[in-house]
């Protein structure tokens, strides 16, 4: 009998590639700053709130992502977007000259798992709706769950105030 089969990936592979590869919090933050740089951000900030349950908020003014880009790039591990000539269009660079990309393997975004058990990712590209996704990184610690079985809630909305209602 001859058959063609595909690899299957356990959800914990995301944990192995993300949190487990990050030495410490400064390294995780550095990876996220690289992503902001690649998005032509002029400003990046990190704010830590609370004592009992600290909440970290990282903000940048990069070009952001559309809903489709979030699904097709951010949620695809090892994307080819850093390869070849996938340059950022001039109108999204905010007057900045073309930058060499800092991210190289398409997995730096997974470093956010080293900062806490959950992450709310919110992005917006000019002329498009906001996109938001809540990620519970603990799901990716389950050794029995296949990656394809982890479903993340992703929503789009038009105004920032709408996020508070959701």
Outline where the language-model segments fall:
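GHKL (Bergerat-fold) ATPase N-terminal catalytic module, capturing the glycine-rich phosphate-binding loop
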Residues: 1-166
């Amino acid at each position: 009998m001859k058959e063609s089969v595909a690899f299957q990936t356990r959800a914990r592979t995301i944990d192995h590639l993300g949190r487990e590869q990050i030495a410490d919090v400064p390294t995780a933050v550095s990876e996220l700053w690289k992503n902001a740089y690649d998005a032509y951000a002029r400003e990046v900030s990190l704010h830590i709130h609370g004592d009992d349950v600290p909440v970290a908020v990282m903000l940048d003014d990069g070009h952001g992502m559309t809903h489709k880009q979030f699904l097709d790039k951010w949620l695809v591990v090892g994307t080819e977007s850093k390869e070849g000539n996938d340059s950022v269009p001039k109108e999204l660079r905010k007057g900045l000259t073309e930058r060499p990309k800092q991210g190289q393997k398409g997995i730096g975004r997974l470093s956010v798992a080293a900062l806490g058990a959950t992450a709310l990712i919110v992005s917006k590209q000019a002329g498009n709706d906001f996109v938001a996704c809540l990620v519970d990184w603990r799901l990716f610690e389950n050794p029995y769950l296949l990656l394809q079985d982890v479903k993340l809630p992703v929503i789009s909305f038009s105004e920032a105030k709408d996020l508070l209602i959701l």
